[in-house]
Design a protein with these regions (language model features):
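Alpha-helical transmembrane segments and their immediate juxtamembrane cytosolic regions
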Residues: 2-481
Length: 481
């Protein structure tokens, strides 16, 4: 039996990347569940681990893009082959931030702010826009090694210059859909979660690593590759350790050197930045990016190493399936959390609203939702091998979505027509509903004050969980003059 760990047989399959992507997707479920339900303060160590999910996912995307784009005969994979998938993922990305999947949510239950949320840059948008840039770069260069070096330099440059694009006021002249690509400064109530500066750097570094892997493990030299898989893994861990140490050494002082000066308005600035801006930029600097990238490399190397020793563990095959069905798991777990469990009717009925659980309750949610997604990924992976059945299920799913689009959420509209005081979004019909009830119109149609909200709540017999009620009242108080 051939030892694929130590042999030098050329290979285009890097298992540690699949394992890393699968693990990142599973931890992502924990991140969202914890942020939604845990009532306490998330420990710093868990916050740090959670902060490695997106860098891992983005790096893997760049790595896979290089291997799939540059063929063994030095040709490039046709862009027409990948464009439909890129388009589908981008469509899913924007639909996840759309006002909803029902006609009522796009019409009577829509608000200007809900439409602005459509342009929020999340991780899927970041992945696709980054890959489109790298695809264009690959087709301009058309040489894998030069592409790899260029991606490396580009990644360093993006991370280096990112803080300068996060200065307050930058990009105010840009339209909302474009501005979020550059920084995460809030604009008209919309904050980009994964702007290209600095998150594109992780995809670029992944592409550079993919070029190195192809050169060392895919290219044939005297009937074998330059390196074995084990050599590549050891180098990966070593590089990860070095850049992690450098990031640790530099991150606390990277932007904090120089002389503080006071401007004409009495605001202290260091190299043009205020203290608040410097604290906000802590995770947007080159050392911070390199620190997290180092951890990603080391974790990936560790997964590859244990996979070589315990290859038969079912956990690895499960992670591989999750990696292959990562888009399904990403969308499904968001719909379970935000579309079902946090749906007002469900959360009010169960008491499972925001910040409503202790450690054990949160853990139960995490385990159950991960379990559901693992089963769904495994089943869909099997179904994909049966094209006719897959197409039939896709047609049935689209039919259900169409019915939901036509009939969904009209009951919500009718509910707020009768009780506009309980609305927490400024729907355009609320003031007309208030006038019909003999109430004084307000600037946005919502409750005049907390007392009015509570009075209608008692009249309707509504009982909200404490955390949910607190959040609704904060919205009412926050908009009062």
């Amino acid at each position: 039996m051939v030892n694929t760990w130590s042999d030098r047989i050329p290979s285009r399959r890097s298992e540690w990347v699949d394992l890393l992507r699968g693990l990142a997707v599973i931890v992502m479920i924990e991140v969202h569940a914890t942020n939604v339900w845990y009532e306490g303060t998330v420990p710093a160590w868990l916050n740090f681990i959670n902060g490695l999910v997106a860098p891992s996912f983005l790096m893997c995307a760049g790595f896979s893009m290089t291997l799939s784009t540059f063929q063994t005969d030095d040709s490039l994979r046709s862009f027409k082959e990948v464009l439909p998938r890129y388009g589908f993922i981008l469509l899913c990305a924007y639909l996840l931030h759309a006002p909803g999947l029902a006609l009522a949510q796009w019409t009577v239950l829509s608000t200007p702010q809900l439409f602005r949320e459509l342009f929020k840059i999340d991780v899927l948008q970041c992945v696709i826009f980054s890959l489109l840039i790298l695809q264009g770069l690959a087709r301009c260069i058309r040489h894998r090694s030069i592409f790899g070096y260029t991606a490396l330099i580009l990644g360093i440059a993006i991370a280096w210059f990112s803080p300068y694009l996060w200065i307050t006021g930058f990009g105010e002249w840009l339209s909302l859909p474009v501005r979020g690509l550059f920084n995460g400064i809030s604009d008209r109530g919309v904050t980009a979660l994964f702007p290209l500066f600095p998150w594109f750097a992780f995809v670029a570094f992944g592409s550079a690593l993919g070029a190195l892997y192809a050169s060392c493990r895919t290219d044939i030299h005297e009937d074998q590759s330059r390196w074995s898989e084990s050599t590549f893994i050891y180098v990966l861990v070593g590089v990860g350790l070095v850049i992690w140490l450098w990031g640790q050494w530099q991150k606390d002082t990277w932007l904090w050197t120089g002389t503080w000066v006071t401007d004409s308005k009495g605001i202290e600035r260091l190299n043009g930045w205020t203290r608040g801006e410097l604290y906000a930029l802590y995770n947007q600097t080159l050392p911070s990016v390199m620190e997290r990238l180092g951890w990603v490399f080391m974790i990936g190397g560790f997964l590859g190493s244990i996979k070589s020793r315990w290859n038969q563990w079912k956990l690895f095959s499960l992670l591989d399936i999750v990696s292959r069905e990562s888009l399904l798991v990403y969308i499904l777990h968001l719909q379970i959390i935000f579309g079902i469990l946090l749906y007002p009717f469900i959360s009010n009925l169960t008491g499972w609203g925001w910040y409503s659980q202790n450690e054990w309750g949160t853990m139960v949610f995490i385990i159950v939702i991960i379990g559901i997604n693992l089963v769904a990924a495994a089943q869909w992976h099997k179904i994909r091998k049966q094209p006719s059945r897959m197409r039939r299920l896709q047609f049935q799913g689209l039919s259900i979505l169409l019915v939901w689009f036509l009939v969904g959420h009209w009951w919500t509209y009718l509910y707020y027509l009768k009780s506009p005081e309980l609305a927490t979004e400024p729907y355009p019909f609320l003031n007309a509903a208030r006038i019909r009830k003999g109430l004084t119109p307000t600037s946005d149609g919502m409750a005049l004050n907390e007392e009015e909200f509570r009075r209608e709540m008692e009249r309707r017999g509504k009982v909200y969980p404490e955390a949910t009620l607190k959040k609704k009242l904060e919205i009412i108080r926050g908009r009062q003059p």
